[in-house]
UniProtKB/Swiss-Prot annotation:
The keyword Signal does not apply. GO terms for molecular function: acetyl-CoA C-acyltransferase activity. The keyword Oxidoreductase does not apply. Belongs to the thiolase-like superfamily. Thiolase family. Signal peptide: none annotated. It comes from Shewanella sp. (strain MR-7). Its main location: cytoplasm. It is found in: Cytoplasm. It catalyses: an acyl-CoA + acetyl-CoA = a 3-oxoacyl-CoA + CoA. Pfam families: Thiolase_C (PF02803), Thiolase_N (PF00108). The gene is fadA. Catalyzes the final step of fatty acid oxidation in which acetyl-CoA is released and the CoA ester of a fatty acid two carbons shorter is formed. The lineage of its organism: Bacteria, Pseudomonadati, Pseudomonadota, Gammaproteobacteria, Alteromonadales. This is 3-ketoacyl-CoA thiolase. The active site is at residues 91, 343, 373.
Amino acid sequence: MKQAVIVDCIRTPMGRSKAGVFRNVRAETLSAELMKGLLLRNPQLDPNAIEDVIWGCVQQTLEQGFNIARNASLLAGIPKTAGAVTVNRLCGSSMEAIHQAARAIMTGMGDTFIIGGVEHMGHVPMNHGVDFHPGLANNVAKASGMMGLTAEMLGKLHGISREQQDAFAVRSHQRAHAATVEGRFAKEIYAIEGHDANGALIKVLHDEVIRPETSMESLAALRPVFDPANGTVTAGTSSALSDGASAMLVMEESKARALGLPIRARIRSMAVAGCDAAIMGYGPVPATQKALARAGITVNDLDVIELNEAFAAQSLPCVKDLGLLDVVDEKINLNGGAIALGHPLGCSGARISTTLINLMEHKDATLGLATMCIGLGQGIATVFERV
């Protein structure tokens, strides 16, 4: 079977969704800039060789509608001979894009793919136009479509305290801030234009949503937002609302080597799994277990892990049940996570994978895992290997 490898991976800075640096920049532009960036960074690649552009996006309406993958690829000047498709596995959409490209390569259905994802949550809110079928109530808990309440449920089932959640959130901001100051995001962030608070055009170089001043004291002052009477989940322990895009160049290994392109990581295994929609945040556990089994390894073999931080109350049960509580500070979300950086839905899968690959290089690690929960009860996971 042919091998799928990551040749390059980049992301935009994460912009604040409310009056942030990308308030005047459309989702198609965020996407197109990254597509162009991949080609500029890898001049050995003939753009005419691109088989398909596979782009994750959840709210496929307004500027994100009508196949944003194609709109963005045309804006980017990618040859019209390349295909383009937008995929939606909710929060796992751009990781699904990785999987689709990898499967195509493994089965001989192309050797060069641009994949990624985008979500401009400032322009297209996550609940825009949502209209669940009334019949879902027959076998799905009514609150399953409210992600914050599913996090409350998961936290209660696993005995996760308010203090544990607050500490996890503080860690996320502290580590993301340290990664920024120390330049550890520099290799993955592809600077693009945005606007400052006064409306002046600027080159955006850093994430806008990290709050380095976050402390246990400041978080303790926040009220529960989803279950005000009995809850523990606050805005401070939930993923930030942000706008952003991420992208990867995925190729068949021998083709990349023949062109003299770098092999940054090989896709070792992939998996998706379902779980009860009422505890959708638990999805990374069964998905990771599948991916590890397919790779023929155990969780102890992993050197670095990126677990998407939808909520602290959701992340901690996954860490606990995967047997990783004792190695959080050595292996998990070492540059912070979505609580600090935000979770632009369609962007996040390729974003955490990009951060993971850069961390693996920084630490000279061999095996890494990227995994995330998915609304309505799914998980998705990818094992990467440096070669």
